[in-house]
C-alpha cells in the first residue's frame, strides 16, 4: 500500500519552532510529528510514503533518509510550485500513488495526532465498499468546525455543514482518509479543496463513508493544541504501553523521559511532560504540562508549566516560565527571570522578565 501525507507550507501557527525545522519535523513526545504517522503506516503494510510539500523538501528528505532504512519504507516528495490546497497535491502525485494494483491509498494531514487505527480503517473501507472512507471524530463544540452528517447505521456520509448555527451533529473530519485510485479521476491539477469540492461530489454519488475514530484526536498545529495533544497522547500511552512512561517518587502523572536525559535530585516532574534526548534537568526543578526538547538544560529550582522549550535552550536558576511561553531553538533565559507567556524567537537571550505575553524578536 501507499500513503500521501499533506505536509503543506510554512507552519506559521507553530512559530518559533518552525523557524528551525519544517513543522512535520518538530518534536512531539520526543520524536518528529511525522514519524508517529510513518511508523503507524508501516505497521499496516504501507511500503511507500509520499510527502506533498511546498517548503524545504530537501530538509525533510535528508532528515528522513535514516528512517527509510530503519523502517524499510520508501519516502519520496511531491513538490508543489504553487499552493494546491488539500486535493490538488493528490493530482500532482498521481503517478506516485497509482501502481495498477487497484489498492486504496491513505491520505493524512501531517498535523493530526491520534492512535492511528489504520487496520480498522482498512477493514471498514473494504466492508462498506465505498470509493472513499474518511475518519471522523466527535467534538464538544461542533459549531467551530465543518460537521460531517452521516447515517449512523451505515456510515454513509449525507452532507457537510460548515460551522452550523444549529446542531446537526458532533462529528468532524479527522484528516485521515482511505481512497480508491478512482478518486484521482475526480481531481484536476489546480488549487482544490478535498473537503469542500471532492468529498461532497463522492457523497452525492453515495460512495463516501465515515468511520468514527476510536480513542483520542488532536490537530497539534498550534501551541495550545500541541500542549493538549501531548496530554491526550500520554493518556493513551498509559493505556497502551505504560512501561514507556517514567516512574519514581519525583514523577507525578504521565511523564515521558528519553533514556539519555538526566534528572537531578529533588525534582518534581509532571503531569503531562515530555523530556527529550540529551536534556539536563538540575536539582529542585518543577515541570508540568510542558515539552522540553532535545539538548535543553534547565538549571536548579526553575519552574516551567504550560510551555514549550525549544531545542538546545537554557533556563536559568529560579527562573519561572508559564502561560504558554514558547522558546525557539537556542534561547537562553537568565536566572530568576519570569515569563508570563509569549513567543521567543531562536537564538535570543532573555535577561529581564516578560510580564505580559509578547513576541521577542
UniProtKB/Swiss-Prot annotation:
> Binding of GDP-alpha-D-mannose: at which residues?
6-7, 85, 109, 111, 146, 173
Reported EC number(s) for this entry are 2.7.7.13
Q: Which reaction does it catalyse?
A: alpha-D-mannose 1-phosphate + GTP + H(+) = GDP-alpha-D-mannose + diphosphate
GO function term, MF aspect, one: mannose-1-phosphate guanylyltransferase (GTP) activity
Q: Name one GO biological process term.
A: protein glycosylation
- Keyword Transferase carried by entry: yes
Record's Pfam families?
GMPPB_C (PF25087), NTP_transferase (PF00483)
Keywords of the record, alphabetical order, are: GTP-binding, Nucleotide-binding, Nucleotidyltransferase, Transferase
Keyword GTP-binding listed: yes
Name the positions where diphosphate binds.
Answer: 9, 11-13, 23
Q: What's in the GO CC field?
A: cytoplasm
Recorded metabolic or biological pathway in which this protein acts: Nucleotide-sugar biosynthesis; GDP-alpha-D-mannose biosynthesis; GDP-alpha-D-mannose from alpha-D-mannose 1-phosphate (GTP route): step 1/1
Identify which top EC class this enzyme belongs to. Answer: transferase
Question: Family, per the entry?
Answer: Belongs to the transferase hexapeptide repeat family.
Instruction: Tell me the function of this protein.
Output: Catalyzes a reaction of the Smirnoff-Wheeler pathway, the major route to ascorbate biosynthesis in plants.
Q: What is this protein called?
A: Probable mannose-1-phosphate guanylyltransferase 3
Q: Which organism is it from?
A: Oryza sativa subsp. japonica (Rice)
Amino acid at each position: 500500500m501507499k500513503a500521501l501525507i499533506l505536509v503543506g507550507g510554512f507552519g506559521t501557527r507553530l512559530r518559533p519552532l518552525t523557524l528551525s525545522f519544517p513543522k512535520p519535523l518538530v518534536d512531539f513526545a520526543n520524536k518528529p510529528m511525522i514519524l508517529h504517522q510513518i511508523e503507524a503506516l508501516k505497521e499496516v503494510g504501507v511500503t511507500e510514503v509520499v510527502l506533498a510539500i511546498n517548503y524545504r523538501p530537501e530538509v525533510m528528505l535528508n532528515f528522513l533518509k535514516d528512517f527509510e532504512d530503519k523502517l524499510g519504507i520508501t519516502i519520496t516528495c511531491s513538490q508543489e510550485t504553487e499552493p494546491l490546497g488539500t486535493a490538488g497535491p493528490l493530482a500532482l502525485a498521481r503517478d506516485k500513488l497509482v501502481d495498477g494494483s487497484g489498492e486504496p491509498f491513505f491520505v493524512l494531514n501531517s498535523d493530526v495526532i491520534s492512535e492511528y487505527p489504520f487496520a480498522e480503517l482498512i477493514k471498514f473501507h473494504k466492508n462498506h465498499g465505498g470509493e472513499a472512507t474518511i475518519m471522523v471524530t466527535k467534538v464538544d463544540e461542533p459549531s467551530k468546525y465543518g460537521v460531517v452528517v452521516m447515517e449512523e447505521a451505515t456510515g454513509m456520509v449525507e452532507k457537510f455543514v460548515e460551522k452550523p448555527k444549529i446542531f446537526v451533529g458532533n462529528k468532524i473530519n479527522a484528516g485521515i482518509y482511505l481512497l480508491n485510485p478512482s478518486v484521482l479521476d475526480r481531481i484536476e491539477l489546480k488549487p482544490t479543496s478535498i473537503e469542500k469540492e471532492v468529498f461532497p461530489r463522492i457523497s452525492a454519488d453515495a460512495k463516501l463513508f465515515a468511520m468514527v475514530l476510536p480513542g483520542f484526536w488532536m490537530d497539534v498545529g498550534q501551541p495550545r493544541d500541541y500542549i493538549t495533544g501531548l496530554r491526550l497522547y500520554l493518556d493513551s500511552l498509559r493505556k497502551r504501553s505504560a512501561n514507556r512512561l517514567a516512574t519514581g517518587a519525583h514523577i507525578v502523572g504521565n511523564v515521558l523521559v528519553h533514556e539519555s536525559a538526566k534528572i537531578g535530585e529533588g525534582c518534581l516532574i509532571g503531569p503531562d511532560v515530555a523530556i527529550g534526548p540529551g536534556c539536563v534537568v538540575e536539582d529542585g526543578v518543577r515541570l508540568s504540562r510542558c515539552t522540553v526538547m532535545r539538548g535543553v538544560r534547565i538549571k536548579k529550582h526553575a519552574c516551567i508549566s504550560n510551555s514549550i522549550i525549544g531545542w538546545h535552550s537554557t533556563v536559568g536558576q529560579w527562573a519561572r516560565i508559564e502561560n504558554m511561553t514558547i522558546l525557539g531553538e537556542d534561547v537562553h533565559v537568565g536566572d530568576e527571570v519570569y515569563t508570563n507567556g509569549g513567543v521567543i524567537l531562536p537564538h535570543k537571550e532573555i535577561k529581564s522578565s516578560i510580564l505580559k505575553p509578547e513576541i521577542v524578536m
